[in-house]
Swiss-Prot record:
Biased segments, Basic and acidic residues type: 284-293
Pfam families per UniProt: PCRF (PF03462), RF-1 (PF00472)
The organism's taxonomic lineage, starting at the top: Bacteria, Pseudomonadati, Pseudomonadota, Gammaproteobacteria, Enterobacterales
SMART domains given in the database record: PCRF
Source species: Erwinia tasmaniensis (strain DSM 17950 / CFBP 7177 / CIP 109463 / NCPPB 4357 / Et1/99)
Keyword Protein biosynthesis: yes
Region (Disordered): 284-314
Classification via InterPro entries: PCRF, Pep_chain_release_fac_I, Pep_chain_release_fac_I_sf, Prokaryotic/Mito_RF, RF-1
UniProt keyword annotation of Cytoplasm present: yes
Name listed for the protein in its UniProt record: Peptide chain release factor 1
Compartments in which it is found: Cytoplasm
Function: Peptide chain release factor 1 directs the termination of translation in response to the peptide chain termination codons UAG and UAA.
PTM annotation (N5-methylglutamine): residues: 235
Family to which the UniProt record says this protein belongs: Belongs to the prokaryotic/mitochondrial release factor family.
Length: 360
């Protein structure tokens, strides 16, 4: 391992011990905000500190085994131990490289999840409903909370569009690779000839931003309409014009929120989504500029981004970005998504490592 990386790891280990001591201090415990911030930092440093400690141990094991090689009686055992220690050292080095990758500050945040029916009419809306149910099940398995903010239901079930907030630690980091186009191939229930149809939906995932990080929005750039809540998400239907639709005139972005009784609360929520959408659009523009020089696995939420195909007759899901196919479609639709999410997270980390290596 490079001396510069070892020095960085030693500094992080020292900081880990320092934070541990601070968490036991009565003054810090009394200051809840500081205590929470230090607890988060401690949790983030724990993995890298433990891994580095194991790597240091593997270096000592290598040194001991190399010294034993000069002893004829111990040589065979020493060679075996040396091989084991070197393999452990190599694996731990790789783990440490991943742990040292720059963290996306948004990864730990809540997120907004938007699912829209694309081509395919009623079948696309039904599939949008299936996708939303799939993500809701996944959120449930991770003990996240899903709050529907706006829903436009399809005529034969599902959704033309559904927007929800996913509340839970790490929600954005796990779901951010879902942004993009999702295709389904199956025989619709309304199909009498048994023909397979292809329909499409788009998914967009954006981090929920703290107020301080929301972009400045000029009130004169907004067109605000009120209407009566209807359908899922608006339980108190036809009572008052509490639902809100906000149009950001410079970008044409439209946001609706209808899940609260209070117009004021719906407006505040809609402005939060709008801010996240404006920032996401800016990030997508930057990513497009970067993607001319490197592959970009993070979708923009545009239908031209082809993420996955869900083929029901064959029971398979294919992720086109990393050429991954799994034959566990039923499990995936029930929210067991780690088999699809984990490989793309690993691929993304590998791309980051390759980019960092290129900078050295």
């Amino acid at each position: 391992m490079k001396p510069s990386i070892v020095a960085k790891l030693e500094a992080l280990q020292e900081r880990h011990e320092e934070v541990e001591a601070m968490l036991g201090d009565a003054g810090v415990i009394a200051d809840q905000e500081r205590f929470r911030a230090l607890s988060r930092e401690y949790a983030q440093l724990t993995d890298v500190s433990q891994c580095f400690r194991q790597w240091q141990q593997s270096q000592e094991d290598i040194e001991t085994a190399e010294m034993m090689l000069s002893d004829a009686e111990m040589r065979d055992m020493a060679q075996e131990e040396l091989q084991t220690a070197r393999a452990a050292s190599e694996e731990l080095e790789q783990q440490l490289q991943v742990l040292l990758l720059p963290k996306d500050p948004d990864d730990e945040r809540n997120c907004y999840l938007e699912v829209r029916a694309g081509t395919g009419g009623d079948e696309a809306a039904i599939f949008a409903g299936d996708l939303f149910r799939m993500y809701s099940r996944y959120a449930e398995s991770r003990r996240w909370k899903v709050e529907v903010m706006s829903a436009n239901e399809g005529e034969h079930g599902g959704y033309k569009e559904v927007i929800a907030k996913v509340v839970g630690e790490g929600a954005y980091g796990r779901l951010k690779f879902e942004s993009g186009g999702h295709r389904v191939q199956r025989v619709p229930e309304t199909e009498s000839q048994g023909r397979i149809h292809t329909s499409a939906c788009t998914v967009a995932v954006m981090p929920e931003l703290p107020e301080a990080e929301l972009p400045d929005i000029n009130p004169s750039d907004l067109k605000i309409d009120t209407f009566r809540s209807s359908g899922a998400g608006g339980q108190h239907v036809n009572t008052t014009d509490s639902a809100i639709r906000i149009t950001h005139l410079p970008t044409g972005i439209v946001v609706e929120c209808q899940d609260e009784r209070s117009q004021h609360k719906n407006k505040a929520k809609a402005l939060g989504v709008l801010g996240s959408r404006i920032r996401a659009a800016e990030m997508a523009r930057r990513q497009q500029e970067e993607s001319s020089t490197r592959r970009n696995l993070l979708g923009s939420g545009d239908r031209s981004d082809r993420n996955r195909t869900y083929n029901f007759p064959q029971g398979r899901v294919t992720d086109h970005r990393i050429n991954l196919t799994i034959y566990r479609l039923d499990e995936a639709m029930e929210g067991k998504l780690d088999a699809l999410i984990e490989p793309i997270v690993q691929e993304y980390q590998a791309d980051q490592l390759a980019a960092l290596s290129g900078q050295d």
